[in-house]
Design a protein with these regions (language model features):
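Active-site neighborhood of HAD-like aspartate-dependent phosphohydrolases
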Residues: 1-58
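Metal-dependent phosphoesterase signature
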Residues: 46-80
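Substrate-recognition element of Asp-dependent hydrolases with the DxDx(T/V) motif
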Residues: 69, 78-108, 120-122
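Substrate-recognition "cap/lid" segment bordering the active-site pocket of phosphatases
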Residues: 98-145, 149-154, 158
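Short acidic-hydrophobic, aromatic-tinged amphipathic segments that line or gate anion-handling sites
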Residues: 120-123, 179-189
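Short, charged, surface-exposed secondary-structure boundary motifs
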Residues: 127-132, 171-179, 192-194
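Acidic, Mg2+-coordinating phosphoryl-transfer loop and its flanking beta/alpha structural elements
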Residues: 144-185
């Protein structure tokens, strides 16, 4: 007899892995622009850098081809937190990473021994959202752990609690008055809300 466990949704980049650190490293190497984390005040690097979208696409293509995704380090406390959470919840990882790097993502998850029950990739360029992935798969979420404010707002509108890892790129929406949005500095604080 299986015991029902509620589900929580979790993003990869900015929540489980410190992808921004790797992206900034290669922005400096490939584009010659030095960015600090506090400089990244928008989720889209091309807006932060003031460069054409096409130039950023070439950057991402190079990141993909050189498998730089595998260099991303786990955020402090993430692995321990997921180990703890798996006892109480179904872990649903939903990422907006492109599907063409699915194998790299799965390799990264395996290499880092990240526990999860289900993994979904959304195709944002085709109008998919993390919320639509949840709704179309009839997943009843207790909460979602995220770093992108636009995805967080989608969940809040549906009455789903969001634990938002606080970064400069998600502070653009200043006046969000919702008990469903909880900003945290890291995993230890996030766990106190679960």
């Amino acid at each position: 007899m299986s015991i029902y466990k509620p589900a929580i949704g979790i993003d990869i980049d900015g929540v489980i892995g410190d992808s921004d650190k790797v992206f900034r490293k290669y922005i400096k190497k490939y584009l010659g622009i030095n960015l600090r984390r506090e400089d990244v005040k928008d989720f889209y690097y091309e807006k932060v850098l003031g460069i054409p979208e096409n130039e950023m696409k070439n950057f991402w293509k190079r990141i993909d081809e050189e498998k730089r995704w595998l260099e991303i380090e786990i955020l402090p406390g993430a692995k321990t937190a997921l180990k703890y959470l798996k006892e109480k919840y179904q872990i649903i990882i939903i990422t907006a990473r492109p599907k063409n790097i699915r194998n790299l993502t799965e390799e990264w998850i395996s290499k880092n021994q990240i526990y999860y029950d289900r993994l979904y990739f959304i195709e944002e360029h085709k109008g998919e959202s993390k919320l639509s992935a949840i709704l179309s798969n009839s997943i009843n979420l207790k909460c979602f752990i995220e770093d992108r404010i636009d995805f967080a707002l989608d969940f809040i509108k549906e009455g789903i609690k969001v634990i938002l890892f606080d970064y400069p790129w998600n502070r653009i929406e200043k006046n969000i008055d919702s008990e469903l949005l909880i900003r945290v500095k890291g995993w230890q604080e996030a766990l106190s809300y679960l």
